[in-house]
């Protein structure tokens, strides 16, 4: 009997180790936050359709990534006034990941949330059809009183 208990304890530790390692990686004390700004310009007249799809997949993925500790926070903004077409944007999302490494988990989180790959791809392809321009830009805050870098 004692040998069986020892084996069961060893098996339990082996199964728990990967989960603990993942938590330790996402909460590393020396990891610095990593910010990325996603900017989207959408075809005129299609902002609502774009946003519904974006909410379904991207916002849900960001919410789950925040629950898992990969995302510290995110902010979504829209412009308050119209601009010229060459500088127009419709949505800016600033995502603060807990570290640069944590930014790489978006795909796995999305696949876990939305296992129907065909539907996800079809709907996300539609969102990209509605997107005229897009970029992801790593950004960083600076001290306005510090010397230039």
Question: What is each model feature region?
Answer:
Residues 29, 60, 64-72, 86-90, ...:
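An amphipathic, aromatic/His-enriched active-site/gating alpha helix that lines ligand/cofactor pockets
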Residues 30-45:
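Acidic/histidine-rich, surface-exposed loop or edge segments in extracytoplasmic proteins
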Residues 37, 41, 76-79, 96-97, ...:
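Active-site-proximal beta-strand/loop segments in catalytic clefts of secreted hydrolases
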Residues 43-89:
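N-terminal, post-signal-peptide region of Sec/Tat-exported proteins
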